[in-house]
């Protein structure tokens, strides 16, 4: 990577109001691609946020006017504000995006990220990833046949449908600003984000490909050649099989030591239980490493199911999700949150950000309360 080339978001100033996972993930994505991200912590901000790579922090009490003025001064120069709060919180704090923030800085992009829709029946309710997936229709697609729907950790709603989709909205607003010169309010929620990600399977439920109940379709665990299988290893290890196409399926069958002519036709779903039983018995005959050796370098679409601890011990390199040839993001270096789980201490690096962003100096423009670490404005000239 050429260090002389700028990162794609270099020069963009992002203010992230501290919150739970989706908002910090949104901020981390922007920081990884060069944005200067300042997290605003409060007296009761969440502790132990591991999604803090490449960020700085200051402490502000948004309910205390002299402290809130620090935030307003920062936002007068910022490009983006990430708001992770429930609907109406900013307004109650006197920080309405349309009536206050955009009037003070017309170029500001205010990204508001909620779990439920802001205009839906659940808008004022608490919730988590499982709830957002539930009302989006996505959760009902996940799980084994005859069993309860099963939540996929909090990856799909919080991070893919929430934080990542919010980044898309922010980038679109920044592109729009290049043409109009104006910022705007961006609204993202995990219900719509998750539902949008599920567009293909949702539409496919109207076709024979995905027309059966949950857990009885090709891609949802019902199909024996798109599933996981336990190996001979003590304690349980697994292989993942994704041999969808017929020519890949033939390679799978040969690798398992089976004769295709002895197997029932896979196109008939009535044969799926028998095929699954045959595959289960075969995979149980060898260890995961032995099966990996059999299928490595083939087009059987068979791979080992690796666990996080194994990847860490093997030195697996965490990389950014998208590589830009001319304007790359920041590489994730060892110790920068790849496997360490390090957190960002409240107030760390924030004073340097204030100096660079708005020219503020401690003791001249603000002071820091001794016990709480809260910043309070002490000069009105620059407010």
Swiss-Prot record:
The keyword Cell membrane does not apply. It catalyses: isopenicillin N = penicillin N. Signal peptide: none annotated. Pathway: Antibiotic biosynthesis; cephalosporin C biosynthesis. Gene3D superfamilies: Crotonobetainyl-coa:carnitine coa-transferase, domain 1 (3.40.50.10540), formyl-coa transferase, domain 3 (3.30.1540.10). SUPFAM superfamilies: CoA-transferase family III (CaiB/BaiF). The keyword Isomerase applies. Belongs to the CoA-transferase III family. This is Isopenicillin N epimerase component 2. It comes from Hapsidospora chrysogena (Acremonium chrysogenum). The lineage of its organism: Eukaryota, Fungi, Dikarya, Ascomycota, Pezizomycotina.
